[in-house]
């Protein structure tokens, strides 16, 4: 498990200038990837609903409320936006934003699985972590589950059967019950699993357990086990399935805190419900107590067309090292800011002989969200 001293952590996160050291060591990073909703948007826009002040997202909004117990270790960005268009083209749909989170570039502007032709031949964060001997893990919901008579179950396969999940799948099953929303619907999307788009971290076009990179991927159920055993990686990427990450509404809608939601509101409620269970689980762990940092990250804004930048995207940091008490930072951030921050934190920056990954060279790190 990576540990960085307090003084070093402050220096690594600084954008420049003199700041006092943060208190305590930096521990594991947990990125929880959410989908397709603006944090704030103009009132006239109603195709999708925004997250801030949305009654379907009470847990998220409790994190943003000063004085609320859930907000104790929370800082968030009020000016986090999509990365700028590249060559005149906005960075949509989802997949190029996930690729950007690893490499600072976008790859192909589609949502196809990595093979046969969506591999991105660029250096990436997880590949550099791996080459430097540091640990990373991609936890993906609905993967590596056993089947009975062709039907998916909720039972996790033995670790010896785990794979690199290169292929998307979805459906319903009478022998499957989602642990968070209680439905029989499942949907794994490779486009939301950024590490599978780089050959250094996907092990090639091999969906069998023999793939040497299989050890870096795990079903989401394994997260609670690793937290309990204090064996989480230095860098942990967590992707809920397409219902729990706010991408899609369950076919029957979703009842949450006594209210039945349908459509876009249901997708928000499903994601909020997921976060309300997973975030406290991580916060209760030794890894979090030892300086762990949770980043609730949203892939892209919605509805901006060819002129992005009008709407903001959700970026929430939860850590004992955060400024806390729902501190909102107005510094302009994008996905490149996260990437630059992680390169500094894990000592993979030019100071240690590494090149900045893509657009992270032009970004501000997330310094304003942390104690100084």
Regions from the PLM with identified roles:
Residues 1-19:
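Gram-negative bacterial Sec-dependent N-terminal signal peptides
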């Amino acid at each position: 498990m990576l540990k960085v001293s307090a003084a070093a952590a402050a220096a690594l996160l600084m954008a420049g200038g003199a700041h006092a050291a943060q208190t305590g060591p930096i521990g594991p990073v947990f990125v929880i990837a959410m989908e397709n909703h603006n944090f704030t948007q103009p009132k006239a826009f109603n195709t999708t609903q925004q997250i801030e002040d949305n009654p379907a997202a009470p847990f998220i909004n409790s994190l943003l409320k000063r004085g609320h117990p859930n907000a104790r270790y929370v800082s968030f960005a009020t000016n986090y936006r999509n990365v700028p268009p590249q060559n005149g083209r906005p960075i949509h749909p989802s997949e190029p934003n996930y690729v950007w989170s690893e490499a600072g570039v976008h790859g192909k502007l589609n949502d196809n699985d990595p093979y046969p032709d969506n591999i991105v031949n660029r250096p990436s964060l997880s590949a550099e972590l791996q080459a430097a001997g540091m640990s990373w893990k991609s936890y993906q919901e609905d993967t590596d589950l056993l089947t009975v008579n062709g039907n998916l179950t909720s039972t996790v396969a033995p670790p010896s059967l785990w794979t690199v999940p290169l292929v998307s799948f979805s459906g319903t099953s009478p022998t499957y019950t989602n642990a968070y929303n209680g439905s029989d619907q499942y949907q794994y999307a490779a486009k939301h699993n950024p590490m599978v788009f780089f050959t250094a971290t996907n092990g090639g076009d091999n969906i069998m357990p023999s793939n040497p990179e299989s050890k870096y991927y795990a079903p989401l159920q394994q997260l609670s086990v690793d937290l309990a055993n204090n064996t989480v990686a230095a860098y942990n990427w967590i992707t809920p399935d397409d219902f729990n990450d706010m991408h899609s509404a369950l076919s029957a809608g979703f009842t949450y805190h006594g209210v039945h939601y349908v459509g876009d509101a249901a997708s928000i409620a499903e994601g909020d419900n997921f976060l309300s269970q997973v975030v406290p689980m991580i916060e209760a762990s030794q890894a979090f107590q030892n300086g762990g940092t949770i980043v609730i990250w949203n892939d892209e804004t919605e509805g901006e067309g060819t002129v992005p930048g009008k709407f903001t995207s959700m970026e929430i940091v939860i850590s004992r090292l955060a400024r806390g008490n729902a501190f909102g930072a107005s510094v302009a951030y994008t996905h490149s800011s996260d990437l630059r921050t992680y390169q500094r934190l894990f000592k993979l920056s030019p100071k240690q002989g590494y090149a900045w990954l893509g657009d992270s060279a032009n970004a501000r790190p997330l310094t304003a969200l942390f104690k100084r």
